[in-house]
């Protein structure tokens, strides 16, 4: 979040228009730092860069940013008991506010993504939300990389998880690339 604030202040100092500032903020803050490095490594490991005909998935955060849409099932920063909300406590379905964002607001945004896109739900909580939305018929016809490990440094098992899921992930990416 610090990166987002810094980019916003920089844009204001440059007297940029608000639309440009917000685009630059999203670009700078989307999976910044170690989480971005881990994500790029895993995307490259799965061949996403080859499927979109670029040298590395890192270009999705730079010169090929128009190919990437990042979002969240809960669109705004959430803090619980003074700490960043991890998606676990409280469980989304135990909070009317979180439930509204995950199951009502998010599907509206998600339905606007042009099909067929490659969708990468990051983490078990997101996969559980997607599973429920799918059962309710609220997920568009996209290609979903279920089982893709969360790239957070806190996920010390991500390399093992990627290895275990790699065959399935490669198959989905290949199907999406050959559409």
Each PLM stretch: what is its role?
Residues 150-160:
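Short, charged, surface-exposed secondary-structure boundary motifs
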Residues 1-118, 127-131, 156-157, 164-176:
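A polyanion-binding, active-site-adjacent surface
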Residues 124:
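Flexible loop residues that form catalytic
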Residues 66, 141-143:
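A short helix-to-beta-strand connector/capping loop
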Residues 135-141:
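Short helix-capping segments at alpha-helix termini
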